[in-house]
UniProtKB/Swiss-Prot annotation:
<dbReference type="GO" id="GO:0098839">
    <property type="term" value="C:postsynaptic density membrane"/>
</dbReference>
<comment type="function">
    <text>Pore-forming (alpha) subunit of a voltage-gated delayed rectifier potassium channel that mediates outward-rectifying potassium currents which, on depolarization, reaches a steady-state level and do not inactivate. The activation kinetics depend on the prepulse potential and external divalent cation concentration. With negative prepulses, the current activation is delayed and slowed down several fold, whereas more positive prepulses speed up activation. The time course of activation is biphasic with a fast and a slowly activating current component.</text>
</comment>
<dbReference type="GO" id="GO:0031901">
    <property type="term" value="C:early endosome membrane"/>
</dbReference>
<dbReference type="GO" id="GO:1902936">
    <property type="term" value="F:phosphatidylinositol bisphosphate binding"/>
</dbReference>
<dbReference type="InterPro" id="IPR001610">
    <property type="entry name" value="PAC"/>
</dbReference>
<dbReference type="InterPro" id="IPR003938">
    <property type="entry name" value="K_chnl_volt-dep_EAG/ELK/ERG"/>
</dbReference>
<feature type="short sequence motif" description="Selectivity filter">
    <location>
        <begin position="463"/>
        <end position="468"/>
    </location>
</feature>
<feature type="topological domain" description="Extracellular">
    <location>
        <begin position="471"/>
        <end position="477"/>
    </location>
</feature>
<feature type="transmembrane region" description="Helical; Name=Segment S2">
    <location>
        <begin position="249"/>
        <end position="269"/>
    </location>
</feature>
<dbReference type="GO" id="GO:0005516">
    <property type="term" value="F:calmodulin binding"/>
</dbReference>
<feature type="region of interest" description="Disordered">
    <location>
        <begin position="961"/>
        <end position="989"/>
    </location>
</feature>
<keyword id="KW-0813">Transport</keyword>
<protein>
    <recommendedName>
        <fullName>Voltage-gated delayed rectifier potassium channel KCNH1</fullName>
    </recommendedName>
</protein>
<keyword id="KW-1003">Cell membrane</keyword>
<comment type="similarity">
    <text>Belongs to the potassium channel family. H (Eag) (TC 1.A.1.20) subfamily. Kv10.1/KCNH1 sub-subfamily.</text>
</comment>
<comment type="subunit">
    <text>Homomultimer. The potassium channel is composed of a homo- or heterotetrameric complex of pore-forming alpha subunits that can associate with modulating beta subunits. Heteromultimer with KCNH5/EAG2. Interacts with ALG10B. Interacts with RABEP1. Interacts (via C-terminus) with CTTN. Interacts (via C-terminal cytoplasmic region) with Ca(2+)-bound calmodulin.</text>
</comment>
<feature type="compositionally biased region" description="Polar residues">
    <location>
        <begin position="962"/>
        <end position="979"/>
    </location>
</feature>
Length: 989
């Protein structure tokens, strides 16, 4: 039984590009390439190309659409360049090129390249067709081939190129010398009609084709339904009561009805219908063939204009022997002439042929499934059928009475007829007019007779039978028996078992509508977007039309295990027959695999795999087409016979999908889970080897394709050219950026000058520098350790000036190996040259400046120290920063052997070689560093406490002296003119 969705068909938008190409290119070998990825990789190849080239589909996937993998030493380089230019310029072109098959056999191909556009008029694919023209390129006449060898070669060439010759034959005229190159290119030229767009679109109907579910056709069907009931009621009435023989008005009405039914026949030749798989058939040829095989003959017989044919007959003589048109008339006792009897017989024949119009009820039968899914409509139709049967039997009951009331032998009225008894009961008896017309007159009227007939048939069909109208003659009794038999059957079937009929006939319909209502309520409750809602509804309708509401799992559970396995093998027979991986499987192995397979139906737009999702299934495409999308680009198009997923039998881990797999059309997939497949392969070891060797995935979702988009390459090229053509940036001399760089350059030059001065001072201070030079040079190829030394004088109590001078000269005089005295914006290392505010600032800021020294600055002069190790030696003394420097040294040199020189400050400037040491020695070294670090931290805390006391003493002296001075002097002390002021504040005081 067809559901509402099945009656309408599957009308969701779908991408039928691949199906259109395959259907229109039955004898063409072609590949499809992505036009938006570098090298235009192949995303689909048909079976013809695989047979022609010798490659498997999985082997050519992701290779260049230019088929560079088929080039060889004899391939023309100029033609290859032209092919590349055609791809780059998105042009349509054709070439003749020599390529090589997989077995390296050279073959001449005629290649046609055509761009495919999407709904945005953007080229997204390339269609490349290949035709073997080797027979036309190789000369038949060859000196090496003579006699039968030449004939065999000619026969082989003609046989291999029979399809091309059949195309060329109609266009070749006798006596013409046709150029093979141009003629072949012209014949194999693809027109624009064979290049559909790559986009999703609703099913299109050709011109002059009407959709069977459109508003116009629905309205027309209702009109036909009403006229069909009109015909079913009036045709039996007119035939039985012999009315409208000469009534022109009714003749015109019946003729109009006949014309409408003839128009309906014409429309049926141009109306779509739903195919067995739920698809909408819009091909005009298929529509016509389907209608001619089904309802055409019946519709044609029911539409013949019998009234018009009967009107052209000579019925004037017949009317002279008929009674009053308003009453029931009978023939005169005088027999009519022979011509009148012949005319009356012909007229009665055509009047009886009107009954053929009842075949129009077939139109109701074919559309009955449109309405019987609703309970109220079914009840109304059943009541109408019962009433229509009573109407037909009433007409037959009157015809029997009209035939029985007149005795042909005695030319008298039979008083045992039910019409005679009815005439007596209602007071209108029959009378013979002997003086006038000489006919029988009187009797009941037409309306009274019809109502009485309908009353009798109704009481008989319902088995009531009041008995006021009863059969008297033998024919009437036989018909009464037939009425009672038919009535009992109709009554018991229609009225006695209505509930049972509904439960048995419409159980699936009720479940279907219950499911639809539940889905609609769910979508409405959670406010699912309209687009997604339509996809859900379309999927449910399409799935129901495919399964007809049958629960496959429930049916299989009823069957025993052996029978269930046989059914599963039958359901998956397409997968087992089409793929060579299952050819060596035993019956037991196939049955085990079939039990694990699942059939999945996908609607257009459904995502089978999302990027990043676990690939836990192996999918076989049985029907439909899908696309594989990676980074918003189509990298493969999968069709019937393709396999995608992951090679579970070779990988130990569960893979993540690197792309999205989306259905383009309605698809049927046969899916087997990873665990189930591995379980079967582990049990059937022999089959597992054959399976892993012969099963080739069309697309492996585990592997990610690395590609570059042409748009990205072009954008990078444009940016590079733009930077190349840009004018250089010219800054004026007084620009802030230029001034900033000049300042950095000056500071760097000053720092380098200070380094050179510091090295000269260090050479004078080091006592054993020259003695150690030779020892250091001897070991310069090994690992070196440099130690940062700091000078510091013993801490002694001094006065304010002495403390200040000592702090500037000793505490803040920190040296890095081979570097200058560190300080903010230091130009000279001699603190005696600074005055006033600058001297006080240096005294307070030296500790912070040492922490700001970066490791990169300390390592800048490392190559120079390596070349002249004796120039950068410094003395190691105790200071507040020595602990930190010492700890850094130890941590940097963890794992190296410590020598006595490392522990002695005197030999710190000597560079030593270090070698790997055992783990225990390393642990001892780390512990020693830890203890030394603790001691250094304690010394640092003591020194910080001493510094705080000195600072508090300085603040106390400043406050005491500030209170004795005037406000003008106080302001001068608190706000000096500049850091480099020559005025010595402390000296002035």
């Amino acid at each position: 039984m067809t559901m509402a969705g099945g009656r309408r068909g599957l009308v969701a938008p779908q991408n039928t590009f691949l199906e259109n190409i395959v259907r229109r290119s039955n004898d063409t070998n072609f590949v499809l390439g992505n036009a938006q990825i570098v090298d235009w990789p192949i995303v689909y190849s048909n079976d013809g190309f695989c047979k022609l080239s010798g490659y498997h589909r999985a082997e050519v996937m992701q290779k260049s659409s230019a088929c560079s993998f088929m080039y060889g030493e004899l391939t023309d380089k100029d033609t290859v360049e032209k092919v590349r230019q055609t791809f780059e310029n998105y042009e349509m072109n054709s070439f003749e090129i020599l390529m090589y098959k997989k077995n390296r056999t050279p073959v001449w191909f005629f290649v046609k390249i055509a761009p495919i556009r999407n709904e945005q008029d953007k080229v997204v694919l390339f269609l490349c067709t290949f035709s073997d023209i080797t027979a036309f390129k190789q000369p038949i006449e060859d000196d090496s081939c003579k006699g039968w060898g030449k004939f065999a070669r000619l026969t082989r060439a003609l046989t291999s190129s029979r399809g091309v010759l059949q195309q060329l034959a109609p266009s070749v005229q006798k006596g013409e010398n046709v150029h093979k190159h141009s003629r072949l290119a012209e014949v194999l030229q693809l027109g624009s009609d064979i290049l559909p767009q790559y986009k999703q679109e609703a099913p299109k109907t050709p011109p002059h084709i009407i959709l069977h579910y459109c508003v116009f056709k629905t309205t027309w069907d209702w009109i036909i339904l009403i006229l069909t009931f009109y015909t079913a009621i009036l045709v039996p009435y007119n035939v039985s009561f012999k009315t409208r023989q000469n009534n022109v008005a009714w003749l015109v009405v019946d003729s109009i009805v006949d014309v409408i039914f003839l128009v309906d026949i014409v429309l049926n030749f141009h109306t779509t219908f739903v195919g067995p798989a739920g698809e909408v058939i819009s091909d005009p040829k298929l529509i016509r063939m389907n209608y001619l095989k089904t309802w055409f003959v019946i519709d044609l017989l029911s539409c013949l204009p019998y009234d018009v044919i009967n009107a052209f007959e000579n019925v004037d003589e017949v009317s002279a022997f008929m009674g009053d048109p308003g009453k029931i008339g009978f023939a005169d006792q005088i027999p009519p002439p022979l011509e009148g009897r012949e005319s009356q017989g012909i007229s009665s024949l055509f009047s009886s042929l009107k009954v053929v119009r009842l075949l129009r009820l077939g139109r109701v039968a074919r559309k009955l499934d449109h309405y019987i899914e609703y309970g109220a409509a079914v009840l109304v139709l059943l009541v109408c059928v019962f009433g229509l049967a009573a109407h037909w039997m009433a007409c037959i009951w009157y015809s029997i009475g009209d035939y029985e009331i007149f005795d042909e032998d005695t030319k008298t009225i039979r008083n045992n007829s039910w019409l005679y008894q009815l005439a007596l009961d209602i007071g209108t008896p029959y009378q013979f007019n002997g003086s006038g017309s000489g006919k029988w007159e009187g009797g009941p009227s037409k309306n009274s007779v019809y109502i009485s007939s309908l009353y009798f048939t109704m009481t008989s069909l319902t088995s009531v039978g009041f008995g006021n109208i009863a059969p008297s003659t033998d024919i009437e009794k036989i018909f009464a028996v037939a009425i009672m038999m038919i009535g009992s059957l109709l009554y018991a079937t229609i009225f006695g078992n209505v509930t049972t009929i509904f439960q048995q006939m419409y159980a699936n319909t009720n479940r279907y509508h219950e499911m639809l209502n539940s889905v609609r309520d769910f979508l409405k409750l959670y406010q699912v977007p309209k687009g997604l809602s339509e996809r859900v509804m379309d999927y449910i309708v399409s799935t129901w039309s495919m399964s007809r509401g049958i629960d496959t799992e429930k049916v299989l559970q009823i069957c025993p295990k052996d029978m269930r396995a046989d059914i599963c093998v039958h359901l998956n027979r397409k997968v087992f027959k089409e793929h060579p991986a299952f050819r060596l499987a035993s019956d037991g192995c196939l049955r085990a695999l079939a039990m694990e397979f699942q059939t999945v139906h996908c609607a257009p737009g459904d995502l089978i795999y999302h990027a990043g999702e676990s690939v836990d299934s192996l999918c076989f495409v049985v029907s439909g087409s899908l696309e594989v999308i990676q980074d918003d680009e189509v990298v493969a198009i999968l069709g019937k016979g393709d396999v995608f997923g992951d090679v579970f039998w070779k990988e130990a881990t569960l893979a993540q999908s690197c792309a999205n797999v989306r259905a383009l059309t309605y698809c049927d997939l046969h899916v087997i889970k990873r665990d189930a497949l591995q379980k079967v392969l582990e049990f059937y070891t022999a089959f597992s080897h054959s399976f892993s060797r012969n099963l080739i995935l069309t697309y492996n979702l585990r592997k990610r394709i690395v590609f570059r988009k042409i748009s990205d390459v072009k954008r990078e090229e444009e940016e590079r050219m733009k930077r190349k053509n840009e004018a250089p940036l010219i800054l004026p001399p007084d620009h802030p950026v230029r001034r900033l760089f000049q300042r950095f350059r000056q500071q760097k030059e000053a720092r380098l000058a200070a380094e050179r001065g510091g090295r000269d001072l260090d050479d004078l201070d080091v006592e054993k520098g020259n003695a150690l030079t030779d020892h250091t040079s001897a070991n310069h190829s090994l690992v070196k350790a440099s130690v940062v030394t700091v000078r510091e004088s013993p801490a002694t109590p001094v006065s304010f000036q002495a403390a200040t001078t000592s702090t500037v000269s000793d505490h803040a005089k920190l040296h890095a190996p081979g570097s200058e005295c560190l300080g903010p914006k230091a130009v000279s290392c001699d603190p005696a040259k600074r005055k006033g505010w600058a001297r006080f600032k240096d005294a307070c800021g030296k500790g912070e400046d040492w922490n700001k020294v970066s490791k990169a600055e300390s390592m800048e002069t490392l190559p120079e120290r390596t070349k002249a190790p004796g120039e950068a030696t410094l003395k190691k003394t105790d200071s507040c920063d020595s602990g930190i420097t010492k700890s850094d040294l130890r941590l940097d040199n963890v794992g190296e052997t410590r020598s006595p020189q490392d522990r002695s400050p005197i030999l710190a400037e000597v560079k030593h070689s270090f070698y790997p040491i055992p783990e225990q020695t390393l642990q001892a070294t780390v512990l020693e560093v830890k203890y030394e670090l603790k001691e250094d931290i304690k010394a640092l805390n003591a020194k910080m406490t001493s510094i705080e006391k000195q600072l508090s003493e300085i603040l106390r002296i400043l406050m005491s002296r500030g209170s004795a001075q005037s406000p003008q002097e106080t302001g001068e002390i608190s706000r000096p003119q500049s850091p480099e002021s020559d005025r010595d504040i402390f000296g002035a005081s």
